[in-house]
Amino acid sequence: MGFTKQYKIDFDIIDNQIVLSNNYFQKHKGSFRKITGTRFGKVIGISEYETSLKTWANMVKIYEDEFDETLSRAGQVIEPKIRDYVIAKTGFNFHSYDPKEVKWDLFPENPVFGGIPDGEPVDVYGKLAYDTNAPMLEIKTTSCDSLVYKKINGNLKIVFDENGMPIVKKINGKKDSWFDSNGKIVISPAYYCQIGLYLYLRNITKGMFAIAFLEPQDYVHPEWFEAKQRDIRLVPVQIDRKAFEVLTNKAQLWYNSFIRTGKSPQLTSQDWEWLRENGIA
């Protein structure tokens, strides 16, 4: 979708910041979005791919992300199958939430942080079972191969060949990037912070990643996906709450400085390029 509000009317660029108009800010500030697990790493500046500006623009609702339809559909269809696989593999009963039913937020009492984990352990009565030492679940689907992408309006989308299959740039290229020289999976700081935020909000410390490596055909026919026929790694993680609080404090400061004021972070050269790609500036 890109920018959904009007440049020079709803927002402007002043002193190297995007500044919301007073009319827009006063009218919409009560509905600005919160910092979720997905946004957390971008907000505190550890994202490999983008600065916090795009996240800011999305949170103040002047910009809406354009998702790759292929990736979105694959995730929606395949993730429940992975969750079932993890339940069978671990014996933990992980519950997933309907975003609409919980209004996209399991932490409505928190004014700054929110979101929905991929799975939470529950007992036979449907009550949270963290007291049994069960972990929180975070699911990641990633391609085995490095695929070819094309940038459209600042967003990357998969490129397909004449047979409707994703074009492979390097076999196992993406999968290899998940492992260190000793063959151990390395969780990126952004992903660690994603589950870390939800662990922190639940006042627990243990989580688990389920990382599924997909083949090209899984993106074309996700309904045919069979978890037992794919490489799925279960990786336990743990946070130190006191250490993690340093990060939540940093994110809280960012929120107070930029969301509550209606003024963005200072624009970087990367931000200016993104704005130009979207017809701004």
Curated annotation (Swiss-Prot):
Coiled coil: none annotated. It holds the Pfam family YqaJ. NCBIfam families: MPN551_DNA_bnd (NF045868). It comes from the Bacteria. InterPro entries: PDDEXK-like_dom_sf (IPR011604), Restrct_endonuc-II-like (IPR011335), YqaJ_viral_recombinase (IPR019080). This is Uncharacterized protein MG373 homolog.
